[in-house]
Amino acid sequence: MSEAIIAKKAEQVELIAEKMKAAASIVVVDSRGLTVDQDTVLRRSLRESGVEFKVIKNSILTRAAEKAGLDELKDVFVGPSAVAFSNEDVIAPAKVINDFTKTADALEIKGGAIEGAVSSKEEIQALATLPNRQGMLSMLLSVLQAPVRNVAYAVKAVAENKEGAA
């Protein structure tokens, strides 16, 4: 191999390693068997969710995972691999891909990483069932408001009882 090709591959490894380090979550999939239309729909859905999706050679992914400190992740780089990176929303890639697997049998989740920790296929699928950030915040808000609401109802009931007795 020429030195130019080796330098280009080393640059790719560095770039992918940086993406892996910066990513809030990474999902590795086997997209073999997807039709062009399905692939286009998947990529559009991921892009709309702020997720970057790339098909990358396993040799480059393996070296990048080693550089990023995700050595255990290289076990999933067998067969054709595509990787979804999300820098902001931890749940987005898992949710979009898991939802898409329900309509496209050819897409298979292989594994991934969540906030720098290697995760199994099952953990990625469990992550996909969680609500997104907005959903979690609204759930937290309703839990925090419940005690205040109960106190307000109790005060109102006491006030009504005193008015009725007077």
From Swiss-Prot:
Q: Does the keyword RNA-binding apply?
A: yes
Q: Which organism is it from?
A: Streptococcus pyogenes serotype M18 (strain MGAS8232)
Q: Gene symbol?
A: rplJ
Stated name of the protein: Large ribosomal subunit protein uL10
Which proteins does it associate with, and in what oligomeric form? Part of the ribosomal stalk of the 50S ribosomal subunit. The N-terminus interacts with L11 and the large rRNA to form the base of the stalk. The C-terminus forms an elongated spine to which L12 dimers bind in a sequential fashion forming a multimeric L10(L12)X complex.
What keywords sit in the KW lines?
Ribonucleoprotein, Ribosomal protein, RNA-binding, rRNA-binding
Q: What is a GO molecular function of this protein?
A: large ribosomal subunit rRNA binding
Q: In its UniProt record, which GO terms are filed under biological process?
A: translation
UniProt keyword rRNA-binding present: yes
Q: Which InterPro entries match?
A: Ribosomal_uL10, Ribosomal_uL10-like_sf, Ribosomal_uL10_bac, Ribosomal_uL10_bac_type, Ribosomal_uL10_CS_bac
Q: Which family does it belong to?
A: Belongs to the universal ribosomal protein uL10 family.
Function as written in the Swiss-Prot or TrEMBL entry: Forms part of the ribosomal stalk, playing a central role in the interaction of the ribosome with GTP-bound translation factors.
Q: What Gene Ontology terms describe where this protein resides (cellular component)?
A: large ribosomal subunit
Return the NCBIfam families for the record: PRK00099.1-1
